[in-house]
Amino acid sequence: MTTAQGMLQGELNFARVPQLLAQTQALGVGGVLDLSGVSNADSAGLALLLELSRRSKAKGLHLSIRGANEQIVQLARFFGLDQILHFE
């Protein structure tokens, strides 16, 4: 099994998602994504996390999200995504 570790920093927002998606291609194979450096996220940021999770699942692997701040976790709960995304 291939696992990867990655870290995202700054804001996960609409303006940055295309750039971040390109930078996170390797994370689509499963592993741990560290969000401890993320200051803020919007719904586009959550969509990025969902896409990375989807890519992992498509390969039969798992993506675990570590270090997410409370704002990100609450936003995921609000949209019911805490049942899909795996927060450590």
Predicted regions and their residues:
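STAS-like cytosolic regulatory interaction modules
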Residues: M1-A44, E51-E88
